[in-house]
Amino acid sequence: RDIFLTLHEYKSGEIDLPDLLIRLCDIPGIQLVKAGFIAQLTLGKVGCLDIHNLRMYGINASTFKFTDTTTYATKRKKAELYIATCERLGGSEYLWDAWCENLAECHPTKFTSKHHVSRVHCDYLGA
């Protein structure tokens, strides 16, 4: 499934946010965390709870994983939980800012500030 088509379906109201994440997870190699990252970067919604964030907030990584046999109902529940968790932790903007700040602190020779981290990611996207 094409990412841009899926994003268009969401923006036009054809699908809701949990289904957007589920459809993005149909792309090989994409799970909820990366789907949340795609939504964060393209729509300013959800967020990316990568391994660093999961550890920081004490969340088990398997909580948001799908397998080949995961039913739609379970995927939907996990997607809803993922969205709710991101919101509970402060939302997309807060998670982005905190992640950029952490990355800048962990890699001071690569990044001058959290703003530099953010700018590099925007540059990669052509934004």
Walk through the language-model features, giving the residues of each.
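C-terminal accessory module of base-excision DNA glycosylases/AP lyases that mediates lesion recognition
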Residues: D2-A127
